[in-house]
């Protein structure tokens, strides 16, 4: 866990970028605070913008921090699988933190404005966004480990975006 926190400290600017991505969807719909299902859908809908970004970030970080020669040299050590997993979990944690912040903001605004909760389907709306964000991060990490090319990053961003749209 300490390695994940170290990577989170090193990549603190990703938290700000994920907050901006959440803001892009949140402030587009002004009436979201009057309906619970709209509010939660907007928070989880930002996954469509965040998932391609997180896949590209993970692919970039693998190429930048752990090039193929370094991964090959450390492959015999006991912690070789932690090389990219700690970094990926840190990126996922920033994405989940941004979703949690906007989920709290949305819930507070819905409570304050006495929003309608008739269309609320909580289990699916709260689970699918974080799972998709995590899956995109691991997909970007896996692609960067398997395909050692600069083209991995734009290909991952485009592929995840097209898969979600």
Name what the model sees in each region.
Residues 1-15:
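Aromatic- and glycine-rich beta-strand/loop motifs that create alpha-glucan
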Residues 19-53, 58, 88-158, 163:
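Secretory targeting signals
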Residues 57-94:
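Helix-loop-helix units of permease transmembrane domains in multi-pass membrane transporters
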């Amino acid at each position: 866990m300490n390695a994940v926190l170290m990577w989170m400290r090193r990549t603190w600017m990703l938290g700000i970028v994920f907050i901006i991505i959440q803001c892009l969807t949140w402030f587009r719909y002004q009436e979201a605070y009057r309906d619970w299902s709209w509010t939660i859908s907007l928070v989880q809908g930002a996954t469509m913008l965040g998932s391609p970004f997180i896949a590209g970030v993970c692919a970039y970080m693998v190429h930048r921090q752990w090039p193929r020669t370094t991964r090959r040299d450390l492959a015999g050590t006991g912690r070789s699988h932690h090389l990219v997993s700690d970094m990926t979990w840190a990126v996922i944690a920033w994405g989940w933190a941004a979703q949690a912040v906007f989920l709290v903001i949305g819930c507070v605004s819905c409570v304050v404005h006495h929003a309608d909760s008739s269309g609320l389907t909580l289990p699916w709306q709260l689970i699918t966004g974080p799972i998709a964000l995590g899956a995109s991060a691991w997909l970007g990490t896996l692609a960067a480990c398997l395909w050692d090319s600069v083209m991995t990053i734009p290909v991952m961003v485009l592929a995840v975006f097209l898969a979600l749209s």
